[in-house]
Amino acid sequence: MFNNVWQKVAALLRAPISSLGLRRFEEHNRRVFVRSPAETRCHPEVLIEVNNMHSAHIAYSYLANVLGELHGARVVGYVVQANRSRKEAFKAWTKRTIGYAPYGAYRSFGTGQVVTPVLTRAQKARARRLFAHVYDGIASKTDIEAMRVSGIWIGDLVYDAYLREYARPTIIKASVEFVTSLRHSLELFVFWQDYLDAHDVRAINVSHTVYGNAIPLRIAVARGIPVYQVNLTHCYRLDAEHLFAYGDFTTFRERFAALPEAVRDAGLAEAQRRIERRFRGEVGVDMAYSTKSAFRAPSHPRLLSESPRKKILIAAHCFFDSPHSYGNNLFPDFYEWLDFLGQMSERTDYDWHIKTHPDFLPGSKEIVEAFVSKYPKLTMLPSDASHHQLIAEGIDVVLTVYGTVGFEYAALGVPVINASMNNPHIAFDFNVHARDVEHYRQLLLQLDALPLVIDRQEVLAYYFMAFIHHSPNLFLSDYDGTIHCLGGYAKQFTPAIYDVWLDQWTLEQHEALLAALVTFVESEDYRMDERHLPPPAAADVFPIPA
């Protein structure tokens, strides 16, 4: 009786704060994903990360049910971060109990228990001992980057978690912030190591393959447990050989060559059309998250000097946004990369320029300005400077770690040097890829002998494979149109996405997606694509240019 009363009270409390879209989504899920009580009580578990990325909940609902069915497992939610105060813990408990977002959405597709990483006294003691051992062994930033615990690599996760949480450009080992962040990362490691020891976990879904979110991933794949990262536009299976999502660019060249000639020709033509749209200044072409174009018409007086010296453009990255998204780079973070280039500016007779992205995050500009003050040979350009203007004024070489300028400047005939072997353009030869720091140094000292001949067809092939061949229309019939309808990329992470998706939902697409996910999971392939969807559904979700 008490449970019935509490359910009614919870419903009354929740009614005014639950969006109509969320309620529609929950009711829809309860209709289409029906599991027996026995299935929800079974011992094996499938872990699904709980977060507020509402568009991803749509994908989670499908993957959770497919994994639960295939493994005969119950779906268990988990949160990434432990509550740091009693107030936070009570707030989270209340939300879970009344089914407030996002917990109501998860409950509707079969998620029962939600695990929070709260450590016991014994676990905290182990984490303290582990911290003392790890911290004493850190002599450099590369030591942090290379950190392994119980043979499992987590250094990159520790590194990027700190940069993001504190919005710092680099790590200072002795700082209270880093000590706190490292302790927290190691506590998460201890918790998830013990959890996987004590529970029969058959699969895990994570939201990110970087930051602390990926600590359960690293421990799981070391034990042979499959891990997935699914969202509205992609679905990846991670293992010991593939620790990062979005890394399929390493096979772009060979996969493009294996396509039928007609598809290759049509793909190159479509890539040409879309690149031209980007270069005309159109915002969001195959980059839904972008809000400004760096290829607008020139709007500044001359920006580069008319000297005979080589003109270098450094395309700065956001310092806090996961430098290790694809793995390790030549430098442990973007700050160290810029500092190296600042030192190189003092050794060379070039005109050095640095530019932030028009969409730079708060704090980035100030850090770049500090570098310009430290290294007077660096000249800071306006963030809204047009790349067309810079090319017209004589930029000779562009430097990036792994940015999109790699293909953009190559398409316009300008050499680009990447400071990473884990960059999205690595399968092709239209950029120069520095192997290590010494190779990078020699390339910069000998720009006149840069070993590069740009084949524009390669640039188009890359663009086709990266942005066209795999459509984003996995769970939506028109992802780009939906983002526009919602009012921008960020709006998909609000409950508004539920209504838009439900208006597009069809039983035929629903069944095709379930079948495709089953095929994908059983295949153990790295990425879900047209191979896993039977025709004609594959033609709708993964269209091939005609």
For each feature predicted by the language model, list its residue ranges.
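Conserved nucleotide-sugar donor-interacting segment of glycosyltransferase catalytic cores
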Residues: 188-243
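Donor nucleotide-activated moiety binding/catalytic core segment of transferases
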Residues: 182-197, 350, 360-407
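A short, glycine/small-residue-rich beta-strand->loop->alpha-helix junction that serves as a flexible
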Residues: 50-60, 206, 321-328
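Short loop/turn segments at strand-loop or loop-helix junctions that form parts
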Residues: 50, 79-82, 232, 311-321, ...
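Conserved N-terminal ligand/cofactor-binding loop architecture of enzyme catalytic domains
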Residues: 1-45, 49, 66-186, 232-293, ...
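A donor-sugar binding/catalytic signature common to diverse glycosyltransferases
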Residues: 212-217, 231, 383-431
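Conserved catalytic-core segment of nucleotide-activated headgroup transferases in glycan assembly
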Residues: 280-370
